[in-house]
Amino acid sequence: MLKTSIAALSVLAFSFHAALAQPLASISDVSQPQRFTQWVQSRCIVSIADSAALKADANASAAAWLEASELPVEAFNAADAVIAQALKTRVGGTAKTDYRVLKCALIAQSADVQALYQQFARQKAQ
């Protein structure tokens, strides 16, 4: 009985590990709206980064999302302004912190960012 249980747990653990070991999706598998959202989040992280390494990595990530986007550069310039303004907004919680990463996630998912995407996607379609 013990051997059977151990064998079953081993198979389960191996299966779980194999599922976690799947490669990440390619940027090309991500939708255009989500590419813009991810760019916004990466650019926001550039603004809040307190280390040169994180800032450089976030800039490189933003560049990758920008290269994969079909939106005009003006969309990204407008989004930078939205990010700068939204970062001034206070976000509260139970911990005594600035919630900077949370702000970036919320900014990326905000109605303002979604509206920018829609505006520039419509212009591109015309």
Give the residues covered by each predicted segment.
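Bacterial N-terminal signal peptides that target proteins for export
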Residues: 1-9
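Low-complexity, polar-biased intrinsically disordered regions enriched in Pro/Ser/Thr/Gly
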Residues: 3, 24-28, 90-94
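Processing junctions and N-termini across compartments
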Residues: 15, 36-38, 98
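Sec/Tat signal peptide C-region and signal peptidase I cleavage site
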Residues: 16-21
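N-terminal secretory signal peptides
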Residues: 22-68
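Compact alpha-helical subdomains of small soluble proteins
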Residues: 54-126
